[in-house]
From Swiss-Prot:
Name of the protein: Altered inheritance of mitochondria protein 4
Keywords of this entry: Cytoplasm
A Pfam family reported for this protein in Swiss-Prot or TrEMBL: NpwBP
Cytoplasm is among the record's keywords: yes
Polar residues composition bias: residue spans: 1-12
Species: Kluyveromyces lactis (strain ATCC 8585 / CBS 2359 / DSM 70799 / NBRC 1267 / NRRL Y-1140 / WM37)
Cysteines joined through disulfide linkages: none
Subcellular location: Cytoplasm
Similarity comment text for this entry: Belongs to the AIM4 family.
Regions of compositional bias (Basic and acidic residues) in chain numbering: 92-101
GO cellular component terms, A-Z: cytoplasm
Length: 101
């Protein structure tokens, strides 16, 4: 066997071992980290009764809330960007007729 080809094979094996070790470390880290879809009690979708894992509904992204800035069940003050009075839309006559029938 040629000395050059033997060295080449050894270096390839070392590279493969290094690549496999790196991948195994990444896999271990993925297992340790919580899934972004399920954040548990830190999820904005968390509810102890209907969503204890805090999993995001289909089509929505789950992000952890900041407990210093996000408070549950607090009244929300609307921001009207300087508008003082916004006229409400007039009720639709057809809708009122259907409700009374």
């Amino acid at each position: 066997m040629d000395k050059h080809s033997l060295q080449q094979q050894v270096s390839q094996l070392k590279r493969k071992n290094i690549e496999n070790e790196d991948l195994s470390d990444v896999r271990k880290e993925d297992i340790k980290k919580p899934m972004s879809a399920e954040l548990g009690i830190k999820s904005i979708f968390y509810d102890p009764d209907w969503n204890p894992s805090g999993k995001a509904p289909f089509g929505l992204k789950n992000i952890p809330y900041n407990p210093r800035t996000f408070r549950r069940d607090t009244p929300i003050e609307p921001r009207l960007n300087g508008l003082k009075e916004i006229p409400l839309p007039k009720p639709n006559i057809k809708d009122q007729d259907q409700k009374s029938s």
